């Protein structure tokens, strides 16, 4: 089960928690994934502790990644990361310190001794100036060091299994190819009877095209999961 975006807004998201309670009780997921912006508040410390305690209370493994708003309050991402790692049911790891971001980690789903699925959690950072002459900041992107780490990890998992292993990527800021794919899908009429929901705002991707360097037959990535459910 996947959630994202302002799960706790200024510590006052009781209606959101009620909705999450209902969904978790009904669906009984094996894993809860938070694809960024768990909190968005000036006083992040209070909101983070409240949100972590709530999600951890379900007794279900859960895996968060950072969004572009999590670190905007009165505590930084390193403090939040430590709190994630202290939570009993949270699978979050800060990840290697020699690549970009906090929270690049992998969840391997096993069947006996074989890894049958790898869930790749990646930090897409927040925002940056793309050029020294930029007047405005733009959404950030996955760094080259992260892509190399991803390739190294997947190749290692494939070697361990002695076969190609399916994998999925979870991230917060979308890559621009998602907007291209969505626009083409709309031009072709969508999928009547299958597509549903409300698109409440425009896409907010980075400007850096990266999917070709991250997706290949040898790496066997199946899907890239973005913040698609905002409640």
Per-range role (PLM):
Residues 1-51:
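N-terminal active-site segment of His-dependent metallophosphoesterases
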Residues 2-5, 40-43, 64-76, 127-130, ...:
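Active-site environment of divalent metal-dependent phosphoester hydrolases
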Residues 20, 32, 37, 67, ...:
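Divalent metal-coordination and catalytic microenvironments
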Residues 24, 111-114, 185-186:
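Short glycine/proline-enriched loop/turn "hinge" motifs that connect secondary-structure elements
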Residues 27-30, 118-120, 133-231:
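His/acidic metal-ligating clusters that form di-metal
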Residues 49-163, 195:
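Extended active-site neighborhood of metal-dependent phosphoesterases/phosphodiesterases
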């Amino acid at each position: 089960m996947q959630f994202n975006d302002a799960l706790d807004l200024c510590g006052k998201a009781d209606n959101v928690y009620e909705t999450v309670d209902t969904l978790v009780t009904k669906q009984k997921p094996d894993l809860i994934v938070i694809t960024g912006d768990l909190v968005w508040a000036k006083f992040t410390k209070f909101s983070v502790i409240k949100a972590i305690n709530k999600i951890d209370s379900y007794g279900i493994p859960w895996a968060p990644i950072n969004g572009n708003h999590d670190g905007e309050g009165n505590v930084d991402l390193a403090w939040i990361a430590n709190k994630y790692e202290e939570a009993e049911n949270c699978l979050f790891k800060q990840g290697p310190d020699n690549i970009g971001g906090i929270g690049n980690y992998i969840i391997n789903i096993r069947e006996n001794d074989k890894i049958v699925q790898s869930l790749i959690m990646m930090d897409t950072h927040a925002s940056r100036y793309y050029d020294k002459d930029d007047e405005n900041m733009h959404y950030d992107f996955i760094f080259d060091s992260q892509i190399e780490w991803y390739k190294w990890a997947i190749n290692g998992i494939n070697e361990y299994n002695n076969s190609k292993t399916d994998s999925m990527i979870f991230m917060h800021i979308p890559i621009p190819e998602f907007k291209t794919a969505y626009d083409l899908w709309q031009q072709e009429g969508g999928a009547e009877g299958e597509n549903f929901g409300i698109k409440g705002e425009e896409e907010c991707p980075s400007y850096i095209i990266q999917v070709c360097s991250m997706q290949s037959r040898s790496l066997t990535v199946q899907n890239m999961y973005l913040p698609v459910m905002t409640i």
